[in-house]
């Protein structure tokens, strides 16, 4: 058997059975040796076939040329030398028999050990084939199935993430539009507030102008009243002076009375026309100023009312936009929180899937290590079996050498005992043996060992001729 390195080596194993016959009574038995690689001992080892048998209890000498049995004569012989040689030979044979029995026991133990190792080898080979054919495929199938599930879940999570990102982008655009609208409304509000401040300033200026005009009107009215009073006093003074002059100058008055009266009437009419004209001009100026101020006040009041309405409307719009922005901000925060939760969940699931993949890889590595260990054990068993086969072959050669060495004194002892014989012819006996040979071939193909077994039946015929002493 050669080392498994790609060359084909065959190992033939057969079963052996020990048979022990009765102890020899007269003389040591003979050993029959077959021409094949198997050997059989007439006293120690029997053939594997049930048809083979061994006869014990008679000493057989060398086979005669004609196959006839030679018998000793009935006369008395001198067996003193033969008895001494026989005793010495018996002692030697007993020692050799004991050694052969020990060798036979060891050989039987080796055979049992080889059978046990073959059974273990077959079991390990079955486990190895099962592990090689099923476990890696099943582990690979489980890994591929889990990887497909992980890829499908990753795709689902990726689509969900894309959808959430699209929603987030849409909400971000809506939020940006609302922020821009809010900025525009805030700018409009600021413009309205600025216009309101300007309008308030104009109203204040108009109010101050109105108050100033009212004060001017009051001063003019006071001046008119003062002028009226002054005119009346002048008229009274003039009348008093005229009356005094009338008392003093009665005659003069009598002569100039019509001219003075006419002059007084003219002066009165002139002053009255001047006063009426001044009063009318003051009233018209006051009315025009009052109308202008009233129109300005009305215009300012209307502008103020419109500004207040616009401010209220802007305030309502700002409040509604603020509420809408707050709602959108809350929605955005909820979506961001949901996105973070999805990312965390995705990270956890990805970590779990990576841990599962690592666990499966570790199991696959352990299975590969176990397969390698089984292969090493199988190789060690093959090495042990090869060593046992070598040892068995060595013991076989030793037994064959001992058998050939022991057969020499038997022939010499038989030649000493034979003198004159009367030949009696007996038919030769043939022993048929059938042996089942198990041929196991171990080949190495692409780094893998392939073991094939076959059984072969061998037939052998052993001619046995009776011998006598």
Swiss-Prot record:
UniProt keywords, alphabetically: Cell projection, Coiled coil, Cytoplasm, Cytoskeleton, Intermediate filament, Nitration, Phosphoprotein
Region: Disordered, residue numbers: 1-60, 447-469
InterPro entries listed in its UniProt record: IF_conserved, IF_rod_dom, Intermed_filament_DNA-bd, Intermediate_filament, Keratin_I
Changes after translation: Phosphorylated; phosphorylation increases after nerve injury in regenerating neurons.
Annotated spans, Tail: 405-469
Region of interest (Coil 1A), residue spans: 99-131
A Pfam family that the UniProt record links to this protein: Filament
GO MF, any single term: structural constituent of cytoskeleton
3'-nitrotyrosine, modified sites: 16, 378
Segments of this protein annotated with the region Linker 2: 239-261
Region described as Linker 1: spans on this chain: 132-142
Chain residue ranges for the region called Head: 1-98
SUPFAM superfamilies referenced in this protein's UniProt entry, alphabetically: Intermediate filament protein, coiled coil region
Protein name per its UniProtKB record: Peripherin
Natural source organism: Bos taurus (Bovine)
């Amino acid at each position: 058997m050669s080392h498994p390195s790609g060359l084909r080596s065959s190992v033939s194993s057969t079963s052996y059975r020990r048979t022990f016959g009765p102890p020899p009574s007269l003389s040591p038995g003979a050993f029959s040796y077959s021409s094949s690689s198997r050997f059989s001992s007439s006293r120690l080892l029997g053939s594997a076939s049930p048809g083979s048998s061994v006869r014990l209890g008679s000493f057989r000498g060398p086979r005669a040329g004609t196959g006839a049995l030679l018998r000793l004569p009935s006369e008395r012989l001198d067996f003193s030398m033969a008895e001494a040689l026989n005793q010495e030979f018996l002692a030697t044979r007993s020692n050799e028999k004991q050694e052969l029995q020990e060798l036979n026991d060891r050989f039987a133990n080796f055979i049992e050990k080889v059978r046990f190792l073959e059974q273990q080898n077959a079991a390990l080979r079955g486990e190895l084939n099962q592990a090689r054919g099923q476990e890696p495929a099943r582990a690979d199938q489980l890994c591929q199935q889990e990887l497909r599930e992980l890829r499908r879940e990753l795709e689902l999570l990726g689509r969900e993430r894309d959808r959430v990102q699209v929603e987030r982008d849409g909400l971000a655009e809506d939020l940006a539009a609302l922020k821009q609208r809010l900025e525009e409304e805030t700018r409009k509000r600021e413009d309205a507030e600025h216009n309101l401040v300007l309008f308030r300033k104009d109203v204040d200026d108009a109010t101050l102008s109105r108050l100033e005009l009212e004060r001017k009107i009051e001063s003019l009215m006071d001046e008119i009243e003062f002028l009226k009073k002054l005119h009346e006093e002048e008229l009274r003074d003039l009348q008093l002076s005229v009356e005094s002059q009338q008392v003093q100058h009665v005659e003069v008055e009598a002569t100039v009375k019509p001219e003075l009266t006419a002059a007084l009437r003219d002066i009165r009419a002139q002053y009255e026309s001047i006063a009426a004209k001044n009063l009318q001009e003051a009233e018209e100026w006051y009315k025009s100023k009052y109308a202008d101020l009233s129109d300005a006040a009305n215009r300012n009041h209307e502008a103020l009312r419109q500004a207040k309405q616009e401010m209220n409307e802007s305030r309502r719009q700002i409040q509604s936009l603020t509420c809408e922005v707050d709602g959108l901000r809350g929605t955005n925060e909820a979506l961001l929180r949901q996105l973070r939760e999805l990312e965390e969940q995705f990270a956890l699931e990805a970590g779990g899937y990576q841990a599962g993949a690592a666990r499966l890889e570790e199991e696959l590595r352990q299975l590969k290590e176990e397969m390698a260990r089984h292969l090493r054990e199988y190789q060690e068993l093959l090495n042990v079996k090869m060593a046992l086969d070598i040892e068995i072959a060595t013991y076989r050669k030793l037994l064959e050498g001992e058998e050939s060495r022991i057969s020499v004194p038997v022939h010499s002892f038989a030649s000493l005992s034979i003198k004159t014989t009367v030949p009696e012819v007996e038919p030769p006996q043939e022993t048929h043996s059938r042996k089942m040979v198990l041929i196991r071939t171990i080949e190495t193909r692409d780094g893998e060992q392939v073991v094939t077994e076959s059984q072969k039946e061998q037939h052998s015929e052993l001619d046995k001729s009776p011998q006598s002493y």
